[in-house]
C-alpha cells in the first residue's frame, strides 16, 4: 500500500481495508454515523426551504443570505452523497460499478471543497457588511447577488478541476495482482497516480486550503477588531454601567464568528487525525474518528444559522408548545 502525503488527493476515508475488514459490522458506529447524517440532512433541508420561501415572498435579502442558502444546499447534497458512500462502507454489498464509484466520490469531494469556499466567502461578506463607510471594503456593500453568483460559479468550476483526478484514480474493480491501492468503500478503490500527478494535485489542494483558511482567519480577526472598537465607543458614550444592545448586524457577525471558529477548530482536528492516520496506517480508531469529524460542521452549521432567524425560532417554539399540548 502506498503512503499519501498530508495534503493528499485521497477522496474520503481511504483505509487499508481487506476482504476480512469488519468496519461494516460494527452496528453502534454505523447507527451513530447514520444518525449524525440524518440530523444534518433534516436541518439543512429546513434551512434551505426557509431561504427559498424568503426569496419567493420577496423579502429584503442581506448580502449573506445567498451564501447561507447555498451553503445549506451544498451541505445537504454532501450529506446525501456521504450517506450513499457510508452505505457501501458499513454494508458489504459490493454492487457498484466504476461509473457509480467515480460519480459519488467525485461529487462528494467537489461539494466538500465548495463548502470550504462558501464558508470563506460568507466570512468575507460579513466582514464587508460590518465594515465602516470609511473602509476600503465599503464599496463592495452594494454589490448585487449577481456578482456573488458569478464568483460562486467560477470557484465551482475551479474546484471541479482540482478534483478531476478522482475520475481517473477511482475504480470499482482493482487490479488484485498488486497491493498498490487503497480501499475507499467496500466497492470502490483508489489507485495512486504517478508521483508527478500526485504531487501536483497535493500542491493544489494545499494552496487551496491554506489560502481560504488564511483569508477566513483574517476576515474573522477583522470582524473581532470592529466589534471591540464599536463596543468601546458605545461604552464611552453611554457609560460603563450600561450594557450596549447589539444590532442585528452585530448579532449576525457574532454568529458567523462562532461558526468560523468552529470550522477552523474542526479543520485543525481533522488535520491531526489525518496525520495520525498517515503515521499509523492500520489504526481503525483514527478511521472511525475521521468518519464522524468530517460531517460535524455540515450537521451543526444549520442549527447555528437557524438560531439567529427570529421567524424560525418562533416557529419552533410554537411547534414545541403544540406538541406539549397534544
Curated annotation (Swiss-Prot):
Alphabetical list of InterPro entries matching this protein: GPCR_Rhodpsn_7TM (IPR017452), Vmron_rcpt_1 (IPR004072)
Membrane topology, Extracellular segments: 1-32, 92-104, 171-209, 276-285
Gene (UniProt): Vom1r100
Cytoplasmic side: 54-70, 128-149, 231-254, 307-326
SUPFAM superfamilies: Family A G protein-coupled receptor-like
Residues passing through the membrane, by range: 33-53, 71-91, 105-127, 150-170, 210-230, 255-275, 286-306
Name of one Pfam family that matches: V1R
Name of the featured protein: Vomeronasal type-1 receptor 100
Keywords, sorted A to Z: Cell membrane, Disulfide bond, G-protein coupled receptor, Glycoprotein, Membrane, Pheromone response, Receptor, Transducer, Transmembrane, Transmembrane helix
Compartments it resides in: Cell membrane
PANTHER family named in the record: VOMERONASAL TYPE-1 RECEPTOR
The family this protein is said to belong to: Belongs to the G-protein coupled receptor 1 family.
